Amino acid sequence: MKTLDLPELSADAAPEFVDAVSAKTWLENVPLANVGAAQQQLLAQLQEFNRYTTKAVSRLAALEVVREAVQFVEIEQARRFTNRALPMAEQESSVFDDTLALWEEMHLGYLRCLQGVIDDEPGIRAEAATVCQRALSYTGLKMFHRHRAYRQVPAHEWRALHEGYARAEELGVAEKPVKDYLNRDVNDTSPRIAYIRALLLGMANPNELSQRQLTFVAFLLERWAEKVEIAAEAPEEDVPPLIIDLQSDICPEREGPEAVEPRYLDVKRLAKSLRNRIGLLRKGESPAKLALGEDCVQPSCEQLLVFLYRQWCQARQPRAAERKRSADPVQACNDIAAIHYYVSGHVFKQPGEAKELTSAQRDQIAAFGRVSTRDEDDYSVVHGYVLEHWQIEDESSQGIKMVRRAGNPGKRYTHGQLIGVRPADSKSFMLGQIRWLMQNDAGDLYAGVRLLAGLPAATAVRPTGLNVMGAKYVQALSLTAVQALNAPPSLVLPSGWYKPKRVVEVYVEGDVKVRLTEMIERGSDQIGRAHV
């Protein structure tokens, strides 16, 4: 069996633990209450330990002792870079890098144990399944935390995952049962199950999922990954099989490039479990009774299961609107006030309010025949409005995939956020909503934007009623009806404005009272879009 490509060991390495006994003693002095300091100590000592020459059985025993402490600090530190806007702030990025580095040191430690298995070191062959499962699990944890941070999984991680499973197959332990007491609920696992968990999470379009949804998918896979089999021959199915190439560096696909060393995922049992639960949810059964967890509520639970069924168990459906490749520039901005400014082309002022000219403005008219627009030009700078420069990668009538390169300045973004976009060949802005986000290690920010139906216009709204007499207008946006899409006219309103059947005043060349009939959706920035 081929030797693993691992860093050189060092004769001057001097870790503070070298086996299970010394690891337990050392851990007693690690300040786990201070997770930042504990993470740094664990990282430093594991780096030193992974340079140290010792027997594979001693290395395995020490790693098994420290892994619970590692798991604890990693989960706690992840709170500092998840549920954050992108791109990451410097401090968030630093914690993220340290978290990945610690997972990688655990992975490297188990790879050194695996090398001991390959070299037939005394006492380690019986632990081959555990070693393979742990190595695959830590590759999966690195991937999972990239998904949670909406960071791109690099090709070398996919290659490491496939190679890890290939080693388990070569050793004949891919299906051998292993206990992992760090799992949340199900302790029974195997190298195959650890591999499947990482594969299916990567196939679930994680850049599109919320943190709650990602946690739920991980919860499901701990229970259901065992339902997916791996075969050397394609299973008999009506849809193209899911193909893994053990010599590749990509996620499995149904109709991807020809595989050099193919394996096939049989998802029939998984598909049956998903279909059964979707059917029972539609009949009114509660998610908790279907073992879907107390946190899973309808209708979002059913919607997510349907989404996962499509990703894992169905052939890729053709897009509703054809996409075309592009490299055209596009301008973008977020925040309703900034979008209003750029859509209207001028500073927002209270509608219908006649203002007396200042002496400076009268002087400008006398000298130049008009009022200077310099104050308006400076307005966007003063208020932090930025027209960002992005580049389109592909587009359709319904959406845009675009990228903002690391060197281009811009705001931070979150899923569901309102965005205004203006392609280079367009004179006007379109409104959209961020559907997915991903940042790569170079700092480039990728976004998928779903375009909202209708032509946008800058408008203003104010409340009605006796208690709000004299209320001022605030910025809002309107969208025209689109008959072809059965989309009625709608308003994009600031946070907190929507109430069922609420009547508001909209300024359209005069005050017009409109009734809000339905909330279409609420963005992550709390901006709502309502039918009128």
Model-derived features: positions:
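Generic N-terminal leader/targeting and pre-domain segments
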Residues: M1-L171
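Short strand-loop-strand
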Residues: W312-S428, Q433-D441, Y446-A458, G465-R529
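Generic hydrophobic, helix-prone segments enriched in Leu/Val/Ile
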Residues: L46, T99, E105-L114, L220-L221, ...
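Extended, domain-scale alpha-helical bundle/helix-rich regions
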Residues: A168-E353
